[in-house]
Amino acid sequence: MTDIETWPGRPYPLGATYDGTGTNFSLFSEVAEAVELSLFDDDGAEVRVPMTEVDAFCWHVFLPRIGIGQRYGFRVTGPWDPSNGHRCNPNKLLLDPYAKAFEGAVDWHPSCFAYDFDDPDTRNDEDSAPHVPKAVVESPYFDWGADRPPDVPLHESVIYEMHVKGFTATHPDIPDLLRGTYAGLAHPAAIEHLQSLGVTAVELQPVHQFIHDSHLVERGLRNYWGYNSIGYFAPHNEYASAGDDGSQVTEFKGMVRSLHEAGIEVILD
């Protein structure tokens, strides 16, 4: 992956967009002086690709033959001016705010922080890449069939607020491997239970990609509820039975399709 062909690409849509021949990458920044796209292989080896095209503050590049499952992040060179909110540092791998899938998690290594703990005014130049999630190029292809939102009138709605993991974790008729996952919620046993209650919509507590707070991790605990999102366009990878290589997106879509087929709407908290 050392010889990367690059085309100018386009500024929109933001994030990573695969079109069948390659992937367009675009990142918005008003203050960046230079942006690099970091690509990672299965072993974590990194290749940096300069993003030299800029339109309306959107830095962009198209990479032929770079496709589904590619791990990536951004590195931004620019002002270091914490008092004005600018902490640009190319040693920090930045998450794509428009990513649709993530692999891995934040492990709260000191390199994840922009500053040194002993001197908060000092810039921390340790590379954070080994300690943060990588965005993943996901597949835009999915067979929705004849899917349509049930569109139940509000006065007829029965909404069940639920936690994907909690709702499916102990259901005796859901296979062990599917408990706590999107696929578990799509299982016939889960759907039949909801239908028996007369439920017309499920309101899912946070399913966006989120992090486990450092103070919880230090105590061997986890952020159960998920109200700490870092990727609003990506389904949380730990709720996927299929893994976090982008398959979580397909699994999430399959869950929505199955619920819709049962006449159940899906609302995100």
Cite the ranges covered by each PLM segment.
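Short proline/glycine-enriched turn/loop motifs at strand-loop junctions of beta-rich domains
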Residues: 28-34, 66
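The feature marks proteins involved in alpha-glucan
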Residues: 1-19, 46, 54, 58, ...
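Carboxylate/His-rich catalytic cores and anion/metal-binding grooves
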Residues: 194-221
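Structural beta-strand segments of beta-rich domains
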Residues: 21-25
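A conserved hydrophobic secondary-structure block that centers on an alpha-helix together
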Residues: 165-202
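Aromatic- and acidic-residue-enriched carbohydrate-binding clefts of CAZyme catalytic domains
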Residues: 173-184, 214-261
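Hydrophobic faces of well-ordered beta-strands that scaffold small-molecule active sites
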Residues: 158-160, 202-204, 266-268
